[in-house]
Amino acid sequence: MSWQTYVDEHLMCDIDGQGQQLAASAIVGHDGSVWAQSSSFPQLKPEEITGIMKDFDEPGHLAPTGLHLGGTKYMVIQGEAGAVIRGKKGSGGITIKKTGQALVFGIYEEPVTPGQCNMVVERLGDYLIDQGL
């Protein structure tokens, strides 16, 4: 299965059969190389990936400055140290799950809820971890 298939079928999927889906998603290597992304995913800046990776290594690193992705600033909210970073901006937000080799990104806007975004992103992330990826 290609990485694009994971994005198209497992991240940009219909959530809970409600006809809702994430606003954007991607699978990105720890080095910032994009493995696959939805057409709506923002253009990443190298320093944004560097900051995200540092927060996984040193939880709380992004809290004072916020999480920046594609030039958009998200307020960092509760996550799981070394595993998940979550951010909020207005009525939407972001979930980033770290696997052995990749970062799985999900960006949502209402009516999708933070919990739905977390579920979609973390489910794929956990699967990739189980596959040694």
From Swiss-Prot:
Domain of life per record: Eukaryota
Alphabetical list of InterPro entries matching this protein: PFN, PFN_euk, PFN_sf, Profilin_CS
CDD domains associated with the record: PROF
Residues found modified as Phosphothreonine: 113
Additional facts recorded: The variability of the residues taking part of IgE-binding epitopes might be responsible of the difference in cross-reactivity among olive pollen cultivars, and between distantly related pollen species, leading to a variable range of allergy reactions among atopic patients.
Similarity comment text for this entry: Belongs to the profilin family.
Name of the molecule in the record: Profilin-4
Organism: Corylus avellana
